[in-house]
A protein has these predicted regions:
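Phosphate/ribose-recognition catalytic cores of enzymes acting on nucleotide-derived substrates
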Residues: 225-286
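Nucleotidyltransferase catalytic core that binds NTPs
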Residues: 2-235, 244, 276, 283
Length: 286
């Protein structure tokens, strides 16, 4: 695996590597979930490119950008072991050159609710940086984690507006032994915060899945089951627990029955704050 830091090095390296090319965009602090993305890309592409870039445009302030974990040495080891051919680790000026003003990219209609409402401008930043990486890497396909359910749908919408027909793939969420979805943000949790997150967020979603499988379809009843778990832990602050049509993110009413709400899957999304760290997770109900 080769590591490059500039656009010129990236272009030179890509010219020497075979196509099709798969891109795995990340912000670093890589873990087994990222390894699963890289492994999935490896199965289909001749060349796998992993990018590491902490994108300032998707954060609310500079302090949040500075706080984000950076572990380049271990990231290089994980990316190579998982099957990456090329690691692109640009600085801000390589992605957003001062001499080339980069306009924001429209994130589309799926970006207005949930994370879009709680974090204004976040998905504009996400759509902009992913579009920029698509421009630089020119991949045939790109891989994203299903945990970030709204994000991957926003990226699918954005990619569909482009002329280069990049295929977007969702990869199943990887969870730790305690059920918590793997996330680079988990590194920012205290030991007690980690325990609190693990005994609420995945447990609440599992209760929903189990109740639905046993025949409970009322959105109101499923919500009550999950919220009871989360509100019992005072160190966990729930932002939202949302039931929506999986394809459109149109929310289901409290009186709706999950099985009758709409054709296709129902997306259950959850966001909570623990130790000042925002954690998100999601499951789908068939």
């Amino acid at each position: 695996m080769r590591t490059v830091t500039t656009r010129a090095e990236l272009e030179q390296s890509l010219a020497q590597l075979p196509r099709p090319v798969a891109l795995v965009p990340t912000m670093g602090a890589l873990h087994a979930g990222h390894a699963a993305l890289i492994a999935a890309a490896r199965r289909t592409a001749a060349t796998v490119v992993v990018s590491i870039f902490v994108n300032p445009r998707q954060f609310a302030n500079a302090a949040d950008v500075a706080r984000y974990p950076r572990t380049l040495a271990s990231d290089q080891q994980l990316a190579e072991a998982a099957g990456a051919d090329l690691l692109f680790t640009p600085d801000v000026d390589q992605i957003y050159p001062p001499s080339e003003p980069i306009a924001n990219v429209e994130p589309g209609p799926l970006a207005t609710r949930l994370e879009g409402a709680s974090r204004p401008g976040h998905f504009t930043g996400v759509a902009t940086v992913v579009s920029r990486l698509f421009d630089l890497v020119r991949p045939n396909e790109a891989y994203f984690g299903a945990k970030d359910a709204q994000q991957v749908r926003v990226i699918e919408w954005m990619a569909a507006q482009r002329s280069d027909q990049i295929s977007i793939h969702r990869v199943t969420t990887v969870r730790d032994s305690d059920g918590l979805a793997l996330s680079s943000r988990n590194q920012m949790l205290s030991a007690s915060g980690r325990v609190a997150a693990a005994k609420t967020i995945p447990v609440a979603l599992s209760l929903i899945a189990e109740a639905y499988a046993s025949g409970v379809t009322s959105v109101a009843m499923l919500r009550t089951l999950a919220e009871r778990v989360i509100t019992a832990e005072p160190s966990v602050t729930l932002d939202y627990l949302d039931f929506a049509e999986g394809a459109t993110l149109v929310p289901l009413s409290e009186s709706a029955q999950v099985g009758d709400a709409a054709p296709g899957e129902v997306l259950v999304s959850l966001a909570a704050v623990v130790d000042g760290v925002r954690l998100i997770d999601a499951i789908t109900l068939p």
